[in-house]
Amino acid sequence: MILQETYTLSNGVKIPKLGLGTWFIPDAQASEAVRTAISLGYRHIDTAQAYENEAGVGEGVRTCGLPREQIFVTSKVAAEHKDYDSAARSIDETLEKMGLDYLDMMIIHSPQPWADFRGGDYAEGNRAAWRALEDTYTAGKLRAIGVSNCRKPDLDNILSDCRVRPMVDQILLHISNTDLGLLDTCTTQDILVEAYSPIAHGEALKNPMIVEMAARYGVSAAQLCIRYVLELGAVALPKTADPEHMKANATVDFTITPDDMELLKQTAPIKDYGEFSFFPVFSGK
């Protein structure tokens, strides 16, 4: 069962292959969503400072009835923190807000502030933020550290001047958005890829080819999308607060044939994410 399967990070820490994404889940609903997911077998919860629901997520983890060490909890340093002091301070604030003594992983949310996504040169700021993560990791408050939305030059920048190598790169990865070059780079550097929005924020469900292929496998289009990123060797982080969707998203114990995987890898890119296109990560940059 996928909820019991894990990958092993470069430092030996095990991370569940399937997690609950919490983007767009309001803080007031987050604790219940987390408790529900954990009751259904989820052991991996992903949040971020920018989601503004860390308090609720932390409450859900603390009150789920399971020992803390059984739940893998990730948060993200806000994209705007591009200096050591603000990044370090934000990590401590996250721990306090969540009511947790440690996080299983903390990652830099973006190599650029959202207002300048894929814009200016923030290499020095990213190295400074990374040092804050390294120091917090060394202090034992974080079990693993990584990055998000990083391309090869961003990764090279961190790798050129680090004491602890990034363990993950959490990226937009789904059918119709598969950067094979970046996946190869991460594999070469022993960086695990995590896929946020593996269902393309719902847009993949509108693709007739995906719907038809899913029917051939006897699964939903969403399940095919989640299985796809798992077949690529990535962590899947579908977001939902709906218990039925949580159950369905975890029912992915099937295999996509190599031929179908090749077809899915070559699916034409999504050019329009509908009402969510204004978000920088969906802008095509």
Where are these regions (language model features)?
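N-terminal binding-site loop/beta-alpha segment at the start of enzyme catalytic domains
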Residues: 1-71, 200, 284-285
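Acidic (Asp/Glu)-rich catalytic clusters
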Residues: 10, 58-68, 95-100, 159-162, ...
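Active-site mouth loops of central-metabolism enzymes
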Residues: 17-28, 77-84, 117-119
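Short, acidic/polar
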Residues: 25-37, 83-98, 153-156, 177-178
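A structural motif
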Residues: 42, 100-103, 142, 166
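A short, structured active-site edge motif that brings together acidic residues
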Residues: 68-81, 102-111, 173
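CE4/NodB-like, metal-dependent polysaccharide N-deacetylase domain
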Residues: 87-108, 135-139
